[in-house]
C-alpha cells in the first residue's frame, strides 16, 4: 500500500469514527430528554414501572378536583376507559383545566400516586397527542365521562 492510499484510509477511518461518536452522543442525549406517554390503564398494568419520569394522559374525573385552602396543591384523578390514577400537583393550573377535560401530566409515580411537576390542559379539540387520542377513543367516544366511569385504583 502506498503512502497516498494509507493516508486516505486513515482519513476515512477517522471520519467514520467521528460520525459514530456523534451518533452515539445524540442518541444518549435524546434518551435522557425523552418522555413516554401512558394512560391510567397502562400504568396500572405496569407498563410505566421501568420509567422514572413519564407523561400520564387521560380525562380529569368529574368531581375529583380538590384544592388545598392554604397552598397551590391540587389533587385530582385522571381516568381512561378502564382505570383511574390519582394525581397531585403543586402549582398554578392552566385556565382550561376542569372536570371531564383532557389532560397530560408530566411527573413520576410515588407511593401509588402520580406526582406531577407540569400539567397541560387540552387547548382545543385539535390538541391531543395521537397516542392519547387513540387510547381515549375506545373509552369515551367524545362523550363526557361521568364521575363513576372508572373506579379509583392504585397501580401495582
Swiss-Prot record:
InterPro entries for the chain: CcmE, CcmE-like_sf, NA-bd_OB-fold
Q: Which residues form a coiled coil?
A: none
How does the record say this protein sits in the membrane? Single-pass type II membrane protein
Q: Does the keyword Iron apply?
A: yes
Regions of this protein lying in the Cytoplasmic compartment: 1-8
Q: GO annotations under biological process?
A: cytochrome complex assembly
Residues binding heme, per UniProt:
123, 127
Residue ranges that the UniProt entry lists as topological domain Periplasmic:
30-156
Q: Which UniProt keywords apply?
A: Cell inner membrane, Cell membrane, Cytochrome c-type biogenesis, Heme, Iron, Membrane, Metal-binding, Signal-anchor, Transmembrane, Transmembrane helix
Q: Which residues cross the membrane?
A: 9-29
Any one GO CC term of this protein is: plasma membrane
Subcellular localization: Cell inner membrane
Q: What is its main location?
A: membrane
Molecular functions per Gene Ontology: heme binding; metal ion binding
SUPFAM superfamilies in the record: Heme chaperone CcmE
Transmembrane among keywords: yes
What NCBIfam families does the annotation carry? PRK13159.1, PRK13254.1-1, PRK13254.1-3, PRK13254.1-5
Q: What does this protein do?
A: Heme chaperone required for the biogenesis of c-type cytochromes. Transiently binds heme delivered by CcmC and transfers the heme to apo-cytochromes in a process facilitated by CcmF and CcmH.
Identify the PANTHER family for this entry. CYTOCHROME C-TYPE BIOGENESIS PROTEIN CCME HOMOLOG, MITOCHONDRIAL
Protein family (similarity comment): Belongs to the CcmE/CycJ family.
This chain's protein is named Cytochrome c-type biogenesis protein CcmE 1
Gene that produces this protein: ccmE1
Amino acid at each position: 500500500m502506498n503512502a497516498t492510499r494509507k493516508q486516505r484510509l486513515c482519513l476515512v477511518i477517522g471520519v467514520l469514527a467521528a460520525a459514530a461518536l456523534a451518533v452515539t452522543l445524540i442518541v444518549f442525549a435524546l434518551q435522557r430528554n425523552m418522555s413516554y406517554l401512558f394512560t391510567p390503564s397502562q400504568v396500572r398494568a405496569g407498563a410505566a414501572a421501568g420509567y422514572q419520569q413519564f407523561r400520564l394522559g387521560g380525562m380529569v374525573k368529574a368531581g375529583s378536583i380538590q384544592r388545598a385552602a392554604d397552598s397551590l396543591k391540587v389533587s385530582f384523578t385522571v381516568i381512561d376507559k378502564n382505570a383511574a390514577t390519582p394525581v397531585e400537583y403543586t402549582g398554578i393550573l392552566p385556565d382550561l383545566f376542569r372536570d371531564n377535560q383532557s389532560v397530560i401530566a408530566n411527573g413520576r409515580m410515588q407511593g401509588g400516586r402520580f406526582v406531577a411537576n407540569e400539567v397541560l390542559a387540552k387547548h382545543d379539540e385539535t390538541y391531543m397527542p395521537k397516542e392519547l387520542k387513540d387510547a381515549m377513543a375506545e373509552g369515551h367516544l367524545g362523550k363526557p365521562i361521568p364521575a363513576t366511569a372508572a373506579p379509583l385504583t392504585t397501580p401495582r
